[in-house]
């Protein structure tokens, strides 16, 4: 047999065995037989000097990386809203029905909420070309070499177009127990073990952990159409992705609640950590209608299992100063394991919280964790507090010794100009990737600039010179020049990035983008009053007050003036909606286009003033149909044939380009 054909046959055979073993849990050959075939494949690869892309030998882990590279996701990875009671789930369904203007029964899909590390897998031309962490939902870190060591994740699929598969990297509880039998340093819990392995620069370390994974959604896809979430899951199964056996369809929220009770009763039998249930609307067209809030999809929610509680000793309380000057008490605890995670820190919200819970240093406290990384102290065990020490209310800032001020239940340091934690946090936020994106700027750098160079405001960043930086510890010629170049490049920035960089309370990335798109100009945003702001979608009264109050602050006004004087040029490309036939129209794109990716054509249409939708109705104005257009094109044709009054037009790619 030809050596290449023999390699192809071995790869196919070994991948089939791995799929049966790691995904279906149905081993069909002995380890000895598998190893023998694997050794034959290695021998052939060495002889031919050729390695097939989906060869299992690619999973062993390559050389250690120097650092993780950033990766921008095609589709946003959203967070989920949360519910803790059946009443909150009922209220969620009521909000959905109100949005849909319908009281019809809704079909939901119920799945486990796994407690591991979120993965976003990119496939092109049938190959796994990228794997990344969630990051901030827009940009994550590439961990493809680490993910390749997960045997359950296919390196190749029978689908050639681009797609992003969302899932969770995990370590089974039984695998952790087996690993710890021979480990020099035993791992404390499966969640940290999985996250630590996937974020280890050395893929060989990842491989030793023998991680698993479950895939649960397709965030982005080209050249295919789905009508339901179940169809997505069937596609994943067909292409041999690891999918949880627990996926239930429920008619109405009452059935969902029944399922949750069943799962809670049996969750201790699971071999993977779960901290809740995810409930999703099954119909994708309904999802399009429901849309998204500023943070969450309206069509999905996470139900968090009843919190677990343990007791431990409160060893100390440290007051920390944040970017806004607010002092927050952080509890240091005797390490304890709760819900599969070892914790040594916990939340105490403010001084009133400390008094209400009657906690003291040295006493035993009740600790609750409900899916959150940082648990909460619920109260003290009174009989352990006799010899404990009262927590002192700060009278001065722990960082700069300024006299503190009270605003409601919170304590603030008013020294915003020279209090180190405040200034360092503001500068780090300003330079962050979602803001001014000054590459190579870290919290350590900000601290050095504050302490060694006396940096007292953000605008002073733009006055730094090579001679200033080269004298700093760990700053060589290249690092100094690169940082100065990055600072200079940040002068030309997008308006929404600049707005976010300013650190307006309650204003995140999306709200900053909404402000930029609506007003189109920094000065107009600064002058906007409460009534102008509160009418914007997703900007309520609290956010509007925050924005108005921020831009009325004399220190803020002065700070912005200094930045503009340094040459900062926030720019925003206003959409010219008067010159395009698509201005104000609803457009649906379906199928694969030759000259445009899905994200690219959506951006182009929005710049033309169009509203891009994912569902067809008689109110749709244009359907742009590419190759392999599916149910959406069929639906558009049915509307036209029905004789209903509509402005709907179907365009192929050439007709679309002719109208631009």
Curated annotation (Swiss-Prot):
Active site residues per record: 113 (n6-amp-lysine intermediate)
Iron-sulfur keyword on record: no
SUPFAM superfamilies: BRCT domain (SSF52113), DNA ligase/mRNA capping enzyme, catalytic domain (SSF56091), Nucleic acid-binding proteins (SSF50249), RuvA domain 2-like (SSF47781)
GO terms for biological process, alphabetical: DNA repair; DNA replication
Family matches, as PROSITE patterns: BRCT (PS50172)
Keywords from the named record: DNA damage, DNA repair, DNA replication, Ligase, Magnesium, Manganese, Metal-binding, NAD, Zinc
GO CC entries: cytosol
GO molecular function: DNA binding; DNA ligase (NAD+) activity; metal ion binding
Assigned EC number: 6.5.1.2
Residues binding Zn(2+), per UniProt: 397, 400, 413, 419
Gene3D superfamilies on file: 5' to 3' exonuclease, C-terminal subdomain, BRCT domain, DNA ligase/mRNA capping enzyme, Helix hairpin bin, Nucleic acid-binding proteins
Cofactor: Mg(2+); Mn(2+)
Catalyzed reactions: NAD(+) + (deoxyribonucleotide)n-3'-hydroxyl + 5'-phospho-(deoxyribonucleotide)m = (deoxyribonucleotide)n+m + AMP + beta-nicotinamide D-nucleotide
Domain BRCT intervals: 577-660
Residues where NAD(+) binds: 31-35, 79-80, 111, 134, 168, 280, 304
Similarity comment text for this entry: Belongs to the NAD-dependent DNA ligase family. LigA subfamily.
Known role: DNA ligase that catalyzes the formation of phosphodiester linkages between 5'-phosphoryl and 3'-hydroxyl groups in double-stranded DNA using NAD as a coenzyme and as the energy source for the reaction. It is essential for DNA replication and repair of damaged DNA.
Protein name, UniProt field: DNA ligase
């Amino acid at each position: 047999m030809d050596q290449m054909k023999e390699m192809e046959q071995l790869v196919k055979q070994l991948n089939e065995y791995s799929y049966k073993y790691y995904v279906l849990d149905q081993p069909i050959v002995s380890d000895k037989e598998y190893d023998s075939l694997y050794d034959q494949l290695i021998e052939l690869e060495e002889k031919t000097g050729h390695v097939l892309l989906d060869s299992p030998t690619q999973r062993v882990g390559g050389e250690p990386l120097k650092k993780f590279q950033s990766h921008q996701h095609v589709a946003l990875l959203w967070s989920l809203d949360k519910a803790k009671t059946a009443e909150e789930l009922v209220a969620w369904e009521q909000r959905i029905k109100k949005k849909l203007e319908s009281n019809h029964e809704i079909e939901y899909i119920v799945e486990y909420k796994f407690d591991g590390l979120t993965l976003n897998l990119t496939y092109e031309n049938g190959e796994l070309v990228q794997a990344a962490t969630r990051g901030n939902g827009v940009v994550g870190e590439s961990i493809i070499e680490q993910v390749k060591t997960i045997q359950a994740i296919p390196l190749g699929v029978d689908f050639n177009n681009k797609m992003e598969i969302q899932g969770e990297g995990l370590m089974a509880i039984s695998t952790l127990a087996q690993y710890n039998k021979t480990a020099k340093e035993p791992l404390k819990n499966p969640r940290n073990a999985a996250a630590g392995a996937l974020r280890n620069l050395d893929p060989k370390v990842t491989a030793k952990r023998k991680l698993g994974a479950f895939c649960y959604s397709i965030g982005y896809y080209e050249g295919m159409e789905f009508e339901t979430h179940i169809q997505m899951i069937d596609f994943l199964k067909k292409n041999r992705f690891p999918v949880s056996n627990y996926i239930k369809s429920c008619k109405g929220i009452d059935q969902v609640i029944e399922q949750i009770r069943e799962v809670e009763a049996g969750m201790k039998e699971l071999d993977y950590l779960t901290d809740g249930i995810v409930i999703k609307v099954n119909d994708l067209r309904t999802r399009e209608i429901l849309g998204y809030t500023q943070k969450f999809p309206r069509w999905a929610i996470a139900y968090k299992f009843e919190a677990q509680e343990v007791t431990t000793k409160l060893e100390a309380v440290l007051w920390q100063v944040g970017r806004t000057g607010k002092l927050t008490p952080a509890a240091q605890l005797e390490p304890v394991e709760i819900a599969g995670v070892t914790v040594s820190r916990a939340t105490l919200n403010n001084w009133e919280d400390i008094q209400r819970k009657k906690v003291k240093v040295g006493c035993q406290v009740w600790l609750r964790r409900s899916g959150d990384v940082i648990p909460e102290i619920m109260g003290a065990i009174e009989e352990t507090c006799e010899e404990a020490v009262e927590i002192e209310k700060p009278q001065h800032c722990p960082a700069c010794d300024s006299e503190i001020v009270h605003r409601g239940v919170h304590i603030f340091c008013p020294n915003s100009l020279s209090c180190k934690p405040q200034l360092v946090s503001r500068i780090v936020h300003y330079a962050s990737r979602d803001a001014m994106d000054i590459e190579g700027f870290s919290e350590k750098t900000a601290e050095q600039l504050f302490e060694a160079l006396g940096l007292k405001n953000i605008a002073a960043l733009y006055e730094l010179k090579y001679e200033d930086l080269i004298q700093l510890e760990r700053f060589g010629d290249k690092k100094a020049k690169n940082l100065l170049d990055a600072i200079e490049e940040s002068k030309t920035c997008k308006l929404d990035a600049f707005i976010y960089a300013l650190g307006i309370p309650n204003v995140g990335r999306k709200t900053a983008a909404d402000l930029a798109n609506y007003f189109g100009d920094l000065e107009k945003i600064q002058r906007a009053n409460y009534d102008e702001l509160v009418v914007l979608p997703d900007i309520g009264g609290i956010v509007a007050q925050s924005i108005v109050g921020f831009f009325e602050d004399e220190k803020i006004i002065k700070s912005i003036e200094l930045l503009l004087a340094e040459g900062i040029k926030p720019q925003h490309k206003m959409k010219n909606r008067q010159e395009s036939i698509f201005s104000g129209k609803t457009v649906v794109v379906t199928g694969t286009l030759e000259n445009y990716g899905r994200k690219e054509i959506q951006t182009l249409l929005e710049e033309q003033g169009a509203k891009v939708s994912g569902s067809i109705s008689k109110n749709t104005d244009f359907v742009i149909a590419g190759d392999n257009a599916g149910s959406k094109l069929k639906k558009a044709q049915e509307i036209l044939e029905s004789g209903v009054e509509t402005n709907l037009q179907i365009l192929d790619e050439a007709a679309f380009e002719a109208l631009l």
